[in-house]
Amino acid sequence: MVNFTVDQIRAIMDKEANIRNMSVIAHVDHGKSTLTDSLVCKAGIIASARAGETRFTDTRKDEQERCITIKSTAISLFYELSENDLNFIKQSKDGSGFLINLIDSPGHVDFSSEVTAALRVTDGALVVVDCVSGVCVQTETVLRQAIAERIKPVLMMNKMDRALLELQLEPEELYQTFQRIVENVNVIISTYGEGESGPMGNIMIDPVLGTVGFGSGLHGWAFTLKQFAEMYVAKFAAKGEGQLGPAERAKKVEDMMKKLWGDRYFDPANGKFSKSANSPDGKKLPRTFCQLILDPIFKVFDPIMNFRKEETAKLIEKLDIKLDSEDKDKEGKPLLKAVMRRWLPAGDALLQMITIHLPSPVTAQKYRCELLYEGPPDDEAAMGIKSCDPKGPLMMYISKMVPTSDKGRFYAFGRVFSGVVSTGLKVRIMGPNYTPGKKEDLYLKPIQRTILMMGRYVEPIEDVPCGNIVGLVGVDQFLVKTGTITTFEHAHNMRVMKFSVSPVVRVAVEAKNPADLPKLVEGLKRLAKSDPMVQCIIEESGEHIIAGAGELHLEICLKDLEEDHACIPIKKSDPVVSYRETVSEESNVLCLSKSPNKHNRLYMKARPFPDGLAEDIDKGEVSARQELKARARYLAEKYEWDVAEARKIWCFGPDGTGPNILTDITKGVQYLNEIKDSVVAGFQWATKEGALCEENMRGVRFDVHDVTLHADAIHRGGGQIIPTARRCLYASVLTAQPRLMEPIYLVEIQCPEQVVGGIYGVLNRKRGHVFEESQVAGTPMFVVKAYLPVNESFGFTADLRSNTGGQAFPQCVFDHWQILPGDPFDNSSRGSQVVAETRKRKGLKEGIPALDNFLDKL
């Protein structure tokens, strides 16, 4: 940190209008970390000489070795805008210094939970797209999440050096490439956004407004149309008119920017802009973007890359570029880097784009409050968040835990939305299961220390006001992964994050040396804390299971477990896939079960969900917290449920939120409400451990048809009803053609045309199928999209690379659940093999339990 003291940062923190919280998001390997470097180096935290190679935000050793970002890291930057630039900011501002909290997040699909955590604490996002390969599956996933969280995007087209040097594109082709990417991104924004009438207004990106940057992170240069518009305005102003005031100048630059993009043409003969592609005397005119922006850049590239010394020297003089003495003797690519870096420094262009176009916390929290806060929209906490008020009650969201150098302790990483958090402040620490007025998941504790996160360093700081991102010490014992910290007694929680992937791949781990078991258990606890996505489960058979999003994610988790969290050698099983149990038709008989004392009877049936309902429950479109009538209306309209039945949903399961439903369609049963809790408990138990092989159920609707109860309350207690309900639910599943569901990945593969055949071969061997194949316009690359069962995905990447000579790059992301073909009762089918394997692994009795165990006769 070169010229920056904590006191200086603390002073800017009070100016909420001048803070920008932003994350950098992109597809894997589109150059996020490299770009982040040029920002960091501009803001004066690493030495500029090293920018581009340091990858400052990749703090972990394995990140630097693998050249991928795994965890999201935070850095504060400081940038001062010149007086001229301040006029471009349309929101309120306070002075010319800006504090930018930047979070570099991973692009790998397996780590998209890290991205979700990063998005929650930011208000804006820099979306990086490789201009050669275009918008990919991960860009889309993350952008969709960002827009759902009401985060405003700006776009950066990275890797222009590749487009110019490798693909040797003509200016017009390059323009078309950019135009297409802008359109693709806007399609995503308009599909998932709320439109111009929504609370955020229009968030479409548009080069004319200056919300699109172009450049190369590796070479360290970038520009938006604003930079070139300023050059030309200055050039024309120098010819005749006198000095312009900052406001008029801004107006002129904005007019100029409108002319530099789209179907506008420039006539070099008389220096006039025209709207038609032909000049009055019929010559074809060049497009302004090509003539006035790309052409100068090509003119810089051409003499330098062809080693024409005299031309190069003239050019450097004309552009008024002052090279360092050591740069003067370079030639070829190194010289090109030096010249472009001086002429169009990436840091300036991007930081200007960020400060001018991304919202400050004051602006953003107005429209994000309803998404962030679960409580009523007019209580003290909500008002404090809406106005980002440092005098309001403290409201802070912890989005993840960051491991410290001290083994086993974590910093809680999060953002202050209202009030001020300070060292020693007594706060209420509320976990995700806290409900106002109850005591569970609530701790009253003082905060030991507040710290600033600085990439590889932390700096202690006295207190931090709202709108800022901060780390806390001494909170980690009371929270698992996320939570809310507040001083307001009646505060509700901040809303829990929705992850776009679900943990479907599991590994069993055990310590090589049995004496190390306590260390392993402790290590698993820490692992669950440090990664927002991972689940650690202890099976009844006593084995420890780690569930993650995919092979790479699990590999990193196991490495962390072995080296950082447990510090012991570990044995691990092969990865196994979670399955779900479901039914494929309605139960063929009405199932009856009697309680152990034979005095109570339950009658039920099971039937499958209509298509799409399970996904709606996963997304939270239909949930237990919803208002009853609204939910009934939704189910009746979209899925044609009977309205009366839709109103009588008892609960969702497993865990009260899962994709199974228990409805009550009984008529006039006495004492029904007294046993409701017991039946619900039995339902939660049965859906968590299904009848086939004790996996979760999915997409099953159970109807309670009739109940006969004993008149005495003592004979219908929980001990009688819960096991009965469970047996009855199992019976109704087994009579409804039960099936297994397996998780399916969506695979996107980028490859050159000649190896597409090899890809089909690999996918067919692994039960995958291709459903879309398209060529990336303007390049020789093909994009193949396919569905691939997760079970077959282990070693898929290696297999694919060996069959295509390493030219195909797959990206797998969990997409949906699909029914495994074949009846699990038929011994030759795939389903029955899976059931047998799973039962054996879990140490259950062989063979699916017989129906007679669950079904009683009258």
UniProtKB/Swiss-Prot annotation:
Annotated positions for site Cleavage: E586, S587, K605, A606
Modified residues (N6-acetyllysine): K235, K239, K272, K275, K439, K445, K619
Cross-referenced Gene3D superfamilies: 3.30.230.10, 3.30.70.240, Elongation Factor G (Translational Gtpase), domain 3, P-loop containing nucleotide triphosphate hydrolases, Translation factors
UniProt keyword terms in alphabetical order: Acetylation, ADP-ribosylation, Cytoplasm, Elongation factor, GTP-binding, Hydrolase, Isopeptide bond, Methylation, Nucleotide-binding, Nucleus, Phosphoprotein, Protein biosynthesis, Ubl conjugation
Protein species of origin: Cricetulus griseus
The protein's role, per its UniProt record: Catalyzes the GTP-dependent ribosomal translocation step during translation elongation. During this step, the ribosome changes from the pre-translocational (PRE) to the post-translocational (POST) state as the newly formed A-site-bound peptidyl-tRNA and P-site-bound deacylated tRNA move to the P and E sites, respectively. Catalyzes the coordinated movement of the two tRNA molecules, the mRNA and conformational changes in the ribosome.
Phosphoserine modifications at: S325, S502, S595
Any single GO BP term: translational elongation
EC number of this enzyme: 3.6.5.-
GO cellular component, one term: nucleus
Gene transcribed to yield this protein: EEF2
Known partners and oligomeric status: Binds to 80S ribosomes. Actively translating ribosomes show mutually exclusive binding of eIF5a (EIF5A or EIF5A2) and EEF2/eEF2. Interacts with SERBP1; interaction sequesters EEF2/eEF2 at the A-site of the ribosome, thereby blocking the interaction sites of the mRNA-tRNA complex, promoting ribosome stabilization and hibernation. Interacts with HABP4; interaction takes place at the A-site of hibernating ribosomes and promotes ribosome stabilization. Component of the mRNA surveillance SURF complex, at least composed of ERF1, ERF3 (ERF3A or ERF3B), EEF2, UPF1/RENT1, SMG1, SMG8 and SMG9.
Residue(s) carrying Phosphotyrosine: Y265, Y373
Modified residues (N6-succinyllysine): K152, K272, K572
Binding site for GTP: 26-33, 158-161, 216-218
Name the UniProt record assigns to this protein: Elongation factor 2
Effect of I714N: Prevents H-715 diphthamide modification and its subsequent ADP-ribosylation by diphtheria toxin. Prevents inhibition of protein synthesis by diphtheria toxin
Modified positions (Phosphothreonine) in chain numbering: T54, T57, T59, T435
Reaction(s) this enzyme catalyzes, per UniProt: GTP + H2O = GDP + phosphate + H(+)
Gene Ontology molecular function, alphabetical: GTP binding; GTPase activity; ribosome binding; translation elongation factor activity
